[in-house]
């Protein structure tokens, strides 16, 4: 809260939800390894009952849209109104160009099923490395995702986790400036 910027954190248990709420976190997200387990999602959902906070839900690590949609339904059933989706790619066996294969067709299908939800893309987790981040972010924008979730660190090589997929704040600003945004804000008629 020192910076005045909104904060967000991943939650996987009721205790983590309680702690995040106690510390005034602005947005919560359910991670891919939690989304894959309906019992874990229900635990998080139960902890959110009666709370008014935006919740983002990452796709499960395996390519199963029913699990993803089920997580959305569980969170919605406890009264959460502001729900969004995060596409972070899916695990695949063997060597691929990506850390998590995008399987864009599955993301598009999920957007078709739940068009009213905010839908953002996490190219950091899809790529797992910096050198293909820009192209993947651009593809997400070309596919009309509503936004991007990109990991940034002042010293990426020394980050405690996922160091290879993080970029500096300066590189993030540069990348965002290079993206060709497809949607333009339409001025309101007042």
Predicted region positions:
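Active-site beta->alpha loop and helix N-cap motifs at the rims of alpha/beta catalytic domains
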Residues: 1-42
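Alpha-helix-loop-beta-strand connector modules within alpha/beta enzyme cores
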Residues: 1-9, 44-54, 104-119, 165-187
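Electropositive, surface-exposed helix/loop patches at the edges of structured domains
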Residues: 9-20, 68-74, 180-190
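Short beta->alpha junction loops/turns
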Residues: 13, 33-34, 60-62, 126, ...
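Glycine-rich phosphate-binding active-site loops on the catalytic face of alpha/beta enzymes
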Residues: 27-38, 143-165
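Catalytic alpha/beta core domains of metabolic enzymes, predominantly
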Residues: 40-155
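Amphipathic, soluble alpha/beta structural segments
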Residues: 85-91, 163-172
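Histidine-acidic metal/acid-base catalytic patches
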Residues: 139, 151, 155-160, 169-182
């Amino acid at each position: 809260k020192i910076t005045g910027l909104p904060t967000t954190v991943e939650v996987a248990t009721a205790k983590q939800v309680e702690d995040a709420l106690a510390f005034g976190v602005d947005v919560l997200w359910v991670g891919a390894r939690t989304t894959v387990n309906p019992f874990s999602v229900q635990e998080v959902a139960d902890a959110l009952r009666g709370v008014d906070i935006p919740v983002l839900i990452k796709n499960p690590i395996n390519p199963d849209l029913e699990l993803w949609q089920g997580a959305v339904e569980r969170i919605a059933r406890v009264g959460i109104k502001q729900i969004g989706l995060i596409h972070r790619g899916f695990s695949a066996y063997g060597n691929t160009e990506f850390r998590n294969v995008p399987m864009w067709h599955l993301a598009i299908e999920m957007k078709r099923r739940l068009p009213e939800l905010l839908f953002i893309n996490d190219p950091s987790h899809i790529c797992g490395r910096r050198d293909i981040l820009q192209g993947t972010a651009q593809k997400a924008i070309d596919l009309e995702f509503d936004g991007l979730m990109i990991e940034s660190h002042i010293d990426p090589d020394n980050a405690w986790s996922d160091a290879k997929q993080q970029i500096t704040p300066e590189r993030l600003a540069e990348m965002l400036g290079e993206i060709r945004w497809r949607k333009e804000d339409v001025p309101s008629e007042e």
